[in-house]
Amino acid sequence: FDAGNARDWDDKLTIEVGSPHAALRSIEISRADDVPTLFIAGDSTVTDRDSGPDVSWGQLLPRFLKPGIAVANNAQSGETLKTFLAALRLDKILSQMKAGDYLFMQFTHNDSKASWPQSYVEPETTFKAYLEVYIAEARRRGAYPVLVTAMNRVNFNAEGKNTNSHDGYPE
């Protein structure tokens, strides 16, 4: 099993207990098909992280939602709109998506790296075209696409002012 490759995902639930002193006596899991699922697609700024101190908004989001909403965080560090498709991550989401679900999308951090030609997504054309695919596929299934603006990197110019690290990408 390779967690970095959607082709290796299966329909099994894996539960990891991180403390050597933790104990689990029993667990009962039942499918809740009647609740909306909020799917998350994105990069390291959204993905679930194994250990702190860094956390992403994607892994904290469930704390702020009312009961009765499932969250499926499919984000992965290093992903772009292009590589998320190539790794079949969007296919994984779409295979589980139903009417009334949500698709939250936050990309840009890696898309904007022109030094990564295999994953670079040009802001004025390709980036928008990929977003249109994600949006159309979610809508085709009766889900609600939600575009989340990428947070700015902390980059300072010579005058000590923070600069826009995602210049040219939609906000």
Predicted regions and their residues:
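Acidic/histidine-rich helix-loop elements
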Residues: D48-P53, N73-A87, A114-E122
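Serine-esterase "nucleophile elbow" of acetyl-processing enzymes
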Residues: N5, K12-Q76, D91-L103
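Alpha-helical cap/lid subdomain in secreted, periplasmic
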Residues: L60, L88-E171
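Extracellular carbohydrate recognition and processing domains
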Residues: F1-A3
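Gly/Ser/Thr-rich beta-alpha loop segments that engage phosphate groups in nucleotides
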Residues: S44, T80, N110
